Amino acid sequence: MTRKFEHIGAPEARSFIVERLSDDALLGRKGFTMRQSTYVLPYPPSQRSYARDLVAAVCADDLPNRGVRAAQVNLYDIVLDYLDSQGMWEPLCEAEQAATRDELIMMLQDTISVTSVIKPAVERLIGEAECDIAFITGVGETFPYVRTHTLLGEIDTDTPIVLVFPG
């Protein structure tokens, strides 16, 4: 299912993505068994806003028009919600002023566990959405303290996942 496009916002990119992601075999429908459950939608970092708009339109309009329930799960939102709920957001912002980049990354890696924080939140959000396919976004915003390869290796869901990332 590999195809490269010059621009993620191109109409042909959108139609290709919708066509592929609404396929019954990919979704495990009508007696088909999914061959794989994780897909990657890379885009150039300079096209971030186009990728965000594309995923929003595909999830809100294109896939539902084909009978596919899609959900977006934003890793950055999960991280911010967790830090805020634990009362860690303000102290982290204060520490950012004095810490080096590497120290800040270490603080975040020690605080935001993929296994105990991110994974359960992603699985919960996918389950609550009762979706046929889930788009994981916010990957660039959480790199390098959230490693998506670790997350994908640990997620336990039958829902196909599309990892949307700058790269």
Outline where the language-model segments fall:
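A short, acidic, amphipathic alpha-helical segment used as a generic capping/interface helix at domain edges
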Residues: 116-128
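Short, flexible loop segments at boundaries between secondary-structure elements
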Residues: 156-167
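Long, charge-dense
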Residues: 70-117
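Short Gly/Thr/Asp-enriched flexible loops that form oxyanion-binding sites at enzyme active sites
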Residues: 144-155
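Short beta-alpha junction loops
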Residues: 76-78, 140, 165-167
